[in-house]
Amino acid sequence: MCDDEVAALVVDNGSGMCKAGFAGDDAPRAVFPSIVGRPRHQGVMVGMGQKDSYVGDEAQSKRGILTLKYPIEHGIVTNWDDMEKIWHHTFYNELRVAPEEHPVLLTEAPLNPKANREKMTQIMFETFNTPAMYVAIQAVLSLYASGRTTGVVLDSGDGVTHTVPIYEGYALPHAILRLDLAGRDLTDYLMKILTERGYSFTTTAEREIVRDIKEKLCYVALDFEQEMATAASSSSLEKSYELPDGQVITVGNERFRCPEALFQPSFLGMESAGIHETSYNSIMKCDIDIRKDLYANTVLSGGTTMYPGIADRMQKEITALAPSTMKIKIIAPPERKYSVWIGGSILASLSTFQQMWISKQEYDESGPSIVHRKCF
């Protein structure tokens, strides 16, 4: 977009990463961890310009001396003071814009508590003085980004996973299923199974190292039992990873045992169904006439769907659950890590969307509850 002064801002606040940029762009300009860090120790050097809190990449780079906190847990904001810091950082440091000059599109998890959307709305209008704002459901944006209006979205990020059936652009709320099992749980699980190998990772800073191991080395096995047998009989699946201090560790069956928890949550001591069964259950809660369209348009979205092998495994598992004649297609766009943001960018730049914004005037007249009437 040439006239940046009126471009809407699109901010996708994930539990793990915040994606932000301008409507009409094809990718977010800023992607940084949703982390606020505070020093663990007393500063002794005068004139160092030490701050009482750090956000995003700066917190990440100084993680050795900080306690890191994620203000968004399971897709829901739990610490509003820290969340304000993240938004402030987004507008002023990352995008370098004045929020009072741009409409802002925010995203939220499906089945989010109502009070949460109200608080988001309130902070945007009262703290940042935005002229207009809107809150969109993440999975719906992912479907827009894939160029569809009908399908079932399996959106799995760092904090929460949900399956959202959408028909002709409408999310079907009775069939949305939510699973509190996502990337952060997999990182914690990998920390645990690496401990069984004799490597100890305990601090919040070390958890970030394990997250990197997970992102670089893990994959989903097509057949878990068979893969376990292969790993036991040969070292062909072993990979080495160099830690920041130069020590090299070896990772074997942990590479696929970690994301296997998505399909078998019992690995984490959870009773819920895996992502394949949750997707199937979501489809089965829909009207019998639209199921065929949903099976043929199963769209993966979010960072936790980035594991190599996940689409093939989903195809195999859902085929086993569905009627034998059903055509099943899993769509895994290469940019699915950012598809929520991309969908937001598309939505906010549509001419038909311009009347959907909640304006400052409407907010002043109705208060925060306006969000339930205008955003659905």
Curated annotation (Swiss-Prot):
Keywords: Acetylation, ATP-binding, Cytoplasm, Cytoskeleton, Hydrolase, Nucleotide-binding. InterPro entries: Actin, Actin/actin-like_CS, Actin_CS, ATPase_NBD. It catalyses: ATP + H2O = ADP + phosphate + H(+). It comes from the Eukaryota. It is found in: Cytoplasm, Cytoskeleton. PROSITE patterns: ACTINS_1, ACTINS_2, ACTINS_ACT_LIKE. GO terms for biological process: actin cytoskeleton organization; mitotic cytokinesis. Its EC number is 3.6.4.-. The modification N-acetylaspartate is found at D3. GO terms for cellular component: actin cytoskeleton; cytoskeleton; membrane raft; striated muscle thin filament. Pfam families: Actin. GO terms for molecular function: ATP binding; hydrolase activity; structural constituent of cytoskeleton. Residues 1-2 form a propeptide. Actins are highly conserved proteins that are involved in various types of cell motility and are ubiquitously expressed in all eukaryotic cells. In this organism there are four genes coding for actin. The sequences coded by genes 1 and 3 are identical. There are a few variations in the actins coded by genes 2 and 4. Belongs to the actin family. This is Actin-4. It comes from Caenorhabditis elegans.
